[in-house]
Each structure stands twice: as structure tokens, then as C-alpha cells.
UniProtKB/Swiss-Prot annotation:
Residues that, per the record, bind Fe cation: 112, 116, 304
The name this protein goes by in its record: tRNA N6-adenosine threonylcarbamoyltransferase
Organism whose genome encodes this protein: Francisella tularensis subsp. holarctica (strain LVS)
One CC-aspect GO term: cytoplasm
Binding site for substrate: 136-140, 169, 182, 276
Family label: Belongs to the KAE1 / TsaD family.
Protein task: Required for the formation of a threonylcarbamoyl group on adenosine at position 37 (t(6)A37) in tRNAs that read codons beginning with adenine. Is involved in the transfer of the threonylcarbamoyl moiety of threonylcarbamoyl-AMP (TC-AMP) to the N6 group of A37, together with TsaE and TsaB. TsaD likely plays a direct catalytic role in this reaction.
Gene Ontology MF terms in the entry: iron ion binding; N(6)-L-threonylcarbamoyladenine synthase activity
Cofactor note: Binds 1 Fe(2+) ion per subunit.
Matches recorded under Gene3D superfamilies: 3.30.420.40
Subcellular location: Cytoplasm
Reaction catalysed by this enzyme: L-threonylcarbamoyladenylate + adenosine(37) in tRNA = N(6)-L-threonylcarbamoyladenosine(37) in tRNA + AMP + H(+)
Amino acid sequence: MIVLGIESSCDETGLAIYDYSKKKLIADELYSQVKLHKKYGGVVPELASREHIAKLNLLAKKIFKETGLSFEDIDCIAYTAMPGLVGALMVGATFAKTLGLIHNIDTIAVHHLEGHLLSPLLDHNSNIEYPFVALLVSGGHTQLFEVKEFGEYSLLGESIDDAAGEAFDKTTKLLGMGYPGGVEVANLADQATDKSKYILPRPMKNKPNLDFSFSGLKTAVLNTWYDEQDQSLENKANLCYAFQNAAIDVLVSKCAKALQKTKNTRLVISGGVSANKLLRHQLDLLAKNREYQIFFPPMKYCTDNGAMIALAGAYRYVNGFKDSNLEINVKARSPL
């Protein structure tokens, strides 16, 4: 069973073809709009939608040409329906529904977060057994789930204000750095010369619940930098180091608590922030010390991509899900 996946929830246009029977990704194409939005310091929704319109058909032609496949080989077309930028989602959903109508192929709506949650399965070496705890950590979401079976997701905790990735992005703006924030902070943190110069708070780290808060950490960065008389690049690197350490410390601590609370031994990490080297290192240490299994997506599939949508669509399709009509139903916000 072969699925075409379409991702267009924000500023990445992604198409991929996944073979469920072989558990193999056949093809993957991605167009990133980062350069387009970089000069604005963030994603401009109208521009994102227009770029999706311009690129989707081109990527589709490319992916079929390179694989030698045709629409006759496709059993289902999966597309991101929620959450995301409504205009961008509309473009992808309309493209998918149109292809489905023309070629008489079933379509299926996919939740963007479910795509992220399953993305570690794109690693051929990943054999993830249920149940497990999952941390979805990105620019828009920071959530902990207990996953008992496919489609059975119990929310354990989430950010009560800024998502972790959002805090990274806002920190770069506060410090007059570039976009996207996660990469900029991590790169500059690696250049820190005085790693103990700044001590920042770990919001909610010691709370017994599994919720997160990153707004206070962001404010602490602002106040610290405002009071700093020597705003040199060296001190900016030191502050990035302190911020990254604080944010990652909270994430790892909450993951450990979630595993203890649910008595699970398997942890899945996904979303854009899962590419962070320090997060991966600290979680690997946690796994080693407590004999947990940690699963990450391949680095190229941490951020938004069509492969995870094709994968999630395949799992939904074999579990009996598919669109019942041609109605376009996308949502900016939607819990998993």
C-alpha cells in the first residue's frame, strides 16, 4: 500500500511517497521558505500560502519523474489538515482533494502533530513498541503524551504559555540575532567562553505536574541582557548557552518525571527542537543511566516534512480512516 503525503502547514512545502507494506520511504521532496521569511524575522502567512501554490505541483512532477511511479500506483493521498496556518493548510488540502478527484484516489486528513509523533519510525532501525511516552517539542507546541496504541494519545502535560521552540525564536529576537531561532541560539551557545557567567531560572522544573512554562525564561533573558553593560558577542554567546541549558534542563526533567509517573521505559522525541544536539545528548544520558529507550527522528525529519505525513497517513488508512467527501476542513488549532 503506497501513500502520497503532502505537508503545507507553515513554511515548508513537502511531498513524499511511503510504502507501508515495505515500511519504506520511496521518495521525499522538500522546499523550505526560510530564506523568504528570514528578512521579516518570522513567517508571513500570506507569503507562505503563495509559495505553497507555486511549489506543490512542481514538487509533485519531480517526485513522480524521479521514482518512475504514476498516480495509478498511489492508494491514498494524505495531507496535513491541522493545526497550522489556515491559508497554507487550505492550499495543501485543496491540492490533495483535487488530485484525489481527478485520479479517483482516496484522500485522508492527517493531524500535523501525529505526523511528528510517528516520525522516528522513518528511521529504519527504529522498532518502537507500545506503550511509550512522547515529547512533541517545536515552535508551536511543547506537549507530553502517553501513547498506548496508534491513535490512543493521552495528554500528560503541556506548556501553559510559550512553546520551547517559540522561546528559542523570541530569544534570538531579543538578542538581535537571526531566524530561525533554534539554530542561531545553538550555534552561538557552542561559542560560549564563560559557561557559568549567567544563571537563569528553570520555570516549573520542580513542580510535581508535567506542564511547562518558558515565558519567564524568555523574560529573564531580556532582563539579563538589558542590565548587561558589556553586550559583546562573547557575552551574547554566554547568555545563549545559559538559556539553552535552562530550557533543555526543564525538558529532560519533565520527560524523566513522565516516564516515572507512567512506568514506561520508552520515550519518543519529535518536533523541530528534537534536532537540538544538547537535548539529544542529555536524553541519551538519561536513557543510559536509567535503562530507558530513547527514539529520535532522523535529523532531516525533525522539522516539517512530507515524509511524516505520508507515514501517518498510511497508518491511518490501514486503520480504516479516510475522507468521506470533498469538503475542505482545516483548522488553525486542534488538540491531538
